[in-house]
UniProtKB/Swiss-Prot annotation:
InterPro entries listed in its UniProt record: RuBisCO_ssu, RuBisCO_ssu_dom, RuBisCO_ssu_N, RuBisCO_ssu_sf
Main localization, broad class: plastid
Name assigned to this protein: Ribulose bisphosphate carboxylase small subunit, chloroplastic 3
Transit peptide: 1-56
Higher taxonomy: Eukaryota, Viridiplantae, Streptophyta, Embryophyta, Tracheophyta
The species this protein was found in: Solanum lycopersicum
Further comment found in the protein's record: The basic functional RuBisCO is composed of a large chain homodimer in a 'head-to-tail' conformation. In form I RuBisCO this homodimer is arranged in a barrel-like tetramer with the small subunits forming a tetrameric 'cap' on each end of the 'barrel'.
Transferase listed as a keyword: no
Its job: RuBisCO catalyzes two reactions: the carboxylation of D-ribulose 1,5-bisphosphate, the primary event in carbon dioxide fixation, as well as the oxidative fragmentation of the pentose substrate. Both reactions occur simultaneously and in competition at the same active site. Although the small subunit is not catalytic it is essential for maximal activity. Involved in antiviral defenses.
UniProtKB keywords: Antiviral defense, Calvin cycle, Carbon dioxide fixation, Cell junction, Chloroplast, Host-virus interaction, Photorespiration, Photosynthesis, Plastid, Transit peptide
SMART domains in UniProt: RuBisCO_small
The keyword Plastid belongs to this UniProt entry's keyword annotation: yes
GO cellular component, one term: chloroplast
């Protein structure tokens, strides 16, 4: 019985020569003595990674007589061909088109909710029902024309909903009243 028991020290010292040379021993951290102690200070602020110094300033959106509406509102009004292209993109992604209109405030303002963020406190009125199963962009454009005829002083926007994820994926102004 005593002959079958080995000491743990004997097992630990018995190793293969190939295994011992596979892992290099830890030598510790490098000494900082090789770095120069006195360095020339760099006073050039353009090399510092910060938010100041070398910043390209952009003008902000002028708030007087230039209201911000929705996506693409900084562009000129979209033509019918451009609207068709946007609607085809919406349909190609499998989103459900829906039209909404607003007769008083087609721009961002705070009425029902005062904190900033995605929700801006506006409620738009839905034009008819969402166009489930619509595959033709001209049908959506015809509804835009009908909404313009019924409410010529209203903003009309097109929204694309993803009915699987249950989120709004796209929204843009299709019509602005005269003078805006």
């Amino acid at each position: 019985m005593a002959s079958s028991v080995m000491s743990s020290a004997a097992v630990a010292t018995r190793g293969n020569g190939a295994q011992a040379s596979m892992v290099a021993p830890f030598t510790g951290l490098k000494s900082t003595a090789s770095f120069p102690v006195s360095r020339k200070q760099n006073l050039d602020i353009t090399s510092i990674a910060s938010n100041g110094g070398r910043v390209s300033c952009m003008q902000v959106w002028p708030p007087i007589n230039m209201k911000k509406y929705e996506t693409l509102s900084y562009l000129p009004d979209l033509s019918d061909e451009q609207l068709l292209s946007e609607i085809e993109y919406l349909l190609k992604n499998g989103w459900v088109p829906c039209l909404e209109f607003e007769t008083e405030h087609g721009f961002v303002y705070r009425e029902n909710h005062k904190s900033p963020g995605y929700y801006d406190g506006r409620y738009w009125t839905m034009w008819k029902l969402p166009m489930f199963g619509c595959t033709d962009a001209t049908q959506v454009l015809a509804e835009v024309q009908e909404a313009k005829k019924a409410y010529p002083q209203a903003w009309v926007r097109i929204i694309g909903f993803d009915n699987v994820r249950q989120v709004q994926c796209i929204s843009f102004i299709a019509y602005k009243p005269e003078g805006y």
